[in-house]
A protein has these predicted regions:
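Motif-centric detector for short Cys/His coordination patterns
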Residues: 1-133
Length: 133
């Protein structure tokens, strides 16, 4: 697969714009983070995939080219182990509706949220509160 002709990060919108010779699309930082191709998130098979919650406001802090086949994204939550190959970026775009719908369903089943948890003051880690729950 040929490399993109351009990759731009829109900081305010928190989205990665990927341009290939035949198409252009934008993927949110949240979507890229929860569908990171790293073994840490994906595991070694579908049954090992980890549900990543609380990333609605995550941002991309750096983009690094990996040869001529992928990019490494570093997120502001410290995650940096996923290599996003060109075909995987296309797949994330092409399958967005199915993948995002599945993610939202998994969150609901796990009683989890896209919003980050906020530690309770004075509790020294004795609890947390998630807005909207």
């Amino acid at each position: 697969m040929s490399a993109p002709t351009n990759i731009t990060y829109r900081k305010k919108a928190r989205e990665l714009v990927v341009t290939f010779s035949d198409t252009e699309f934008a993927l949110s930082a949240e979507y890229l983070r929860v569908y990171s191709p790293s073994a840490e998130v994906r595991g070694h098979g579908p049954e090992e995939r980890k549900l990543v919650a609380g990333k609605k406001h995550v941002a991309i802090s750096s983009i690094e080219a990996i040869g001529n086949y992928a990019i490494r994204l570093t997120f502001d939550d410290g995650h940096d182990t996923g290599l996003y190959a060109w075909n995987y970026l296309r797949e994330l775009n092409d399958e967005f509706d199915a993948y995002w719908g599945e993610y939202l369903k998994e969150l609901k089943m796990a009683n989890a949220s896209r919003l980050p948890q906020i530690p309770l003051a004075g509790g020294a880690g004795i609890g947390s509160w998630t807005p909207g729950q």
